[in-house]
Amino acid sequence: MRRAFPSKDRPLAQMTASIPVALSAVLWLAVTPAQARPVCMIVASTSGTILHEDGDCRTRVTPASTFKLPLSLIGFDSGFLKDAQDPVLTYRKGDPDWGGKAWTQPNDPASWLRHSVVWYSQRITRALGTAELTRYAASFDYGNADMSGDPGKDNGLERSWIASSLKISPVEQVLFLGKLIERRLPVAANAIDQTIAIVESQTAGGWTVSGKTGTAYPRKADGSFDRARAWGWYVGWARRDGRTLVFARLDQDETQQSVSGGLRARDALLGEWEAIAGSLPR
């Protein structure tokens, strides 16, 4: 690991037995679908103080499509991405198409993030190359910053962030997001502005919640994908009355599901957000 993680806020740790925090933990379990196991729910200030942490938030796993947040910063900072509508790229035969009709249509940066289009990500990564992507990821302290891909397959530019070499923990997600919001990342201000502008937002309990979902299947011992154990991420930030919090939620399925893990993690977080946010110290 590149650096030691900040420890939990000690006064908060002493408060975890209080009724509001205990209630939010119960709601966290209750809102999660029975087929998914909650792995981690973590909330922090943008400065990096951990305000709420349930579960295993320190183990690194694949970021899946949540990697599109740093990749958007990289794309805009490098000049490959121009603005929300430029460049418009077209689907090519052989590109990933499992995301449905939206993936086989022309896409711009806004629709790329909205529909989580894998091939659009691959156009960015191939234009930048492994060395440059690794440099950016390391400068962001983004997990292990390993963009090499599957061992011996030379596929890092295609899928290093999808159940492959790149791994990040929930606590590292919120630390990265805090630096994004506070503009402490080594990229141009315009790259941050453009990225924030294309991230989808929802409302929950008077908060505006912005974030990115991610879903990926872990590998079995034989290298095949375990479709019954999908990871589901939702990471982002929430704003209300001048206050901004960053969060990461990670679930893992126990049986194969028809709706992606990331979408279910997002909906579960939105359902519990008001209770969790209300339990936090100011």
Go through each PLM region and give its residues.
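Bacterial N-terminal signal peptides
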Residues: 16-30
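Flexible glycine/proline-enriched surface loops and loop-helix/loop-strand junctions
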Residues: 52-58, 105-106, 114-121, 152-161, ...
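N-terminal secretory signal peptides that target proteins for export/translocation
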Residues: 1-16
